[in-house]
Amino acid sequence: KPQILFLESKGYSIIPVTNGRDAIDRCKTERVDVVFLDESMPGISGLEALAEIKRNRPSLPIVMITKNEEEDIMEEAIGSQITDYLIKPVKPNQILLTLKKIIDNKRLVSAKTNSDYQKEFQQIFSTIQDHLDHKQWTELYKKLIHWELELEKSSDNGMKEVLNMQKQEANVEFNKYIIRHYIDWIKGKDKDAPIMSHNLMAEKVVPVLKADPNTPTILVLIDNLRLDQWRTIQPMINESFRMVQDDSFYSILPTATQYSRNAIFAGMTPLEISKQFPTMWKNDDDEGGKNMHEADFLEAWVKKTFHGSIKHQYVKITNHRDGELLENNIMNYMNNKLTVIVYNFVDMLSHARTEMEVLKELASDEAAYRSLSVSWFDHSPLLNALRKLADKDINLLLTTDHGTVRVQDPSRCIGDRETTTNIRYKTGKNLNFEERDVYAVRVPEEIGLPKSRLSSSYIFAKENKYLVYPNNYNHFVNYYKNTFQHGGISLEEIICPVVKLSRK
């Protein structure tokens, strides 16, 4: 046959058989990389042969060739996990292209991705050096994430190293940008400021509630969800929902739950919260949980924003059992105007990864951390709960409170006994530190933060630095190196996803 001669001329070795039974036998005894299976053969049908081959060799790629364009035949073949489907008459070049897709796909994708990134490398480098505004920084970060996810498909570690260097350069410049503008943003002096934690509800939730008051709005906040993690779980969400708006906001400093999430639900800076709710706000050195009053802050925000209460509910998920209850009760929230669901898993994963050796191995870098997050989300009660809402008329908002960064460079820091233990930021008095490694704020009120003592100040670790005390310095350097932490200044911690979804 001309197809066989053509493929042999391209260097492929062909095993021709005339019926399904022979195909099954040869697949058992020969080293076969791909099977092209005619749907109509003497003896058993192509679909029957397909099922038998798959039983023996589940991962073997099989391409079905047929002249039958009936939908049910195609659906049955696709349901049997064929790799591709060709309709007769089949040209030799079609078979060649299919082979390249199957056998050479990884190599070809890797080569093309590397080539495309190389072409864009200089443009990204130039962009990093420009004077970017907050929107341009977000776009640059999204572009870096895009290439990070693309290069994951490549086996060329050299290109990944180049991209990591670009990310580090970007974070150096991003830190300068944040330090230059942050005080003006918090004080409301910069009209071009990004959406931030304390005005996220006003900018993203209020417009939805006012534009569509009769449709239930559900806000899901997955804590500690980086933008790249969102990108990897997004395809699972897209299966059930239509993306209406894919946006982002900037977390306030410190990029830590007690600050950013309380600010989100109160709709005010931590300094304003501490003044308005002095018994509810907890400073770092106070005892007790720091996020125990989110429902109270939300209640106060709703009353203030809507001049009276609307039917709303706050739900917090901190373990798998809570998640299962959420999945079972999700339809009850359709009776609320606003439902806020805080899902705590990713933050727990981040902290556990620091403390558990097995998780250090499972999430050794960003790619592994993303993979672990995808696996969790795919099997989580949260995804099951969202799927139950997929055909309902709702406004679904999904966001986070802050991101996280893999720390790699230790920086010495000295404080007194009251100084906080977080290794990405510190607050206390008499702080000694390496000036070049941190953003130091000696008047916390300037950036909307309360102080627990008259002389308290804050320092925030830059880029991928982490703050380590001199006592047992080497032990803690090694203990925390390459762990995921938050509280400081980096693209990964500050630029957060906020998306609006609706039913398809």
In which residue ranges do the predicted regions lie?
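Two-component/phosphorelay signaling modules centered on CheY-like receiver
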Residues: 1-15
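Feature captures the catalytic ectodomains and active-site-proximal regions of enzymes
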Residues: 5-6, 40, 64, 75, ...
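Acidic catalytic/metal-coordinating carboxylates
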Residues: 18-22, 45-48
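Active-site beta3 strand of CheY-like receiver
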Residues: 30-36
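Alpha4 helix (beta4-alpha4-beta5 surface) of REC/receiver domains from two-component response regulators
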Residues: 48, 69-84
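C-terminal output helix
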Residues: 90-99
